[in-house]
């Protein structure tokens, strides 16, 4: 009986560890709009080794602060951001091009290259879980 309890406990622990390793984390990004305009924000995030999620639009009015939760993203360093309030990458920024839906909310796991109502934009890699629109130096 003791042996069965030990085997059962080992199986339970193993199955718990396997399930925990398969669960995807979510990434929280705190956005603050320091500009004088309403700003629409989109994200391009790695959700596993070969898949990317492109999602938008999150609209922030001037002075607004708030979190965005990217479901399935595992690491903030695998997240790129785009916004329509004068995002100009610097020489030290890592950039990535992706397609966003024009003027409509979207969540895409497949590239939408040259599809109707989509345009290609340049995203910038996030360096931290907090991002301020405007006053970029």
Name the predicted role of every residue range.
Residues 1-11:
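Bacterial N-terminal signal peptides that target proteins for export
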Residues 1-2, 18-22:
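Glycine-centered signal
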Residues 4-5, 16, 91, 96:
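Short, intrinsically disordered low-complexity segments
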Residues 10-18:
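Bacterial N-terminal signal peptides
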Residues 21-34, 38-73, 80-137:
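Intrinsically disordered, low-complexity segments enriched in small/polar residues
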